[in-house]
């Protein structure tokens, strides 16, 4: 769990335990994963919906499938706070909880497909496949999952996403731009193999590489004649203006550019 997620959840928890609407002993039993005590309180009529079904959210966050089942069987609202329980379960990698929540009606596309986004962020391949199979939008956040798989070299995920309709050129070729900016040749080769538009947005990827001094990327572009001479001349200018003289010298040595200067 990242620090930011942990801090957010602690703030929420502190808000809950200070609320007059929450039975503190019930919350203690939830926090300590004491299923027997939780059932006892529920049978005594404790409000399972207190603080927007916080008990279900907390149990989902903790990957406690048994408690999640108990709470839902006692009427917990699976859609509370825009299906936040599903978001937490996906965020924490709680695959079995995710499957149970969806089986019981959770909206897989709630919170702008946050469940899929969190699964992609943690590179949880099986969860990604499951969520997409259940209708999650593969194009969420301008194909975030595809960009993330390229950035982190998760090629199994990348291949699955491409085979299921992800847009390799989404967001003006953001995946390619990231790879070129990082001088990530293996990613560039993979994107080219899957027919990415290598010249998208006026060869932005090449110009970024020249600006940053990423010689390997510049060499890949020129050796494969990906961009026209006009854009290679632009790259030459970018390199010179940003003191990337190793890139400038390389581009200057290219006969097709030299003849145009």
From Swiss-Prot:
Residue stretches of each ANK repeat: 21-50, 51-80, 81-110, 112-140, 142-170, 171-203, 231-259
Gene3D superfamilies for this protein: Ankyrin repeat-containing domain (1.25.40.20)
Claim: Membrane is one of the keywords in the record: no
Top-level lineage group: Viruses
SMART domains (UniProt xref): ANK
Keyword tags: ANK repeat, Repeat
InterPro entries: Ankyrin_rpt, Ankyrin_rpt-contain_sf
SUPFAM superfamilies xrefs: Ankyrin repeat
Name under which the protein is recorded: Putative ankyrin repeat protein L99
Native organism: Acanthamoeba polyphaga mimivirus
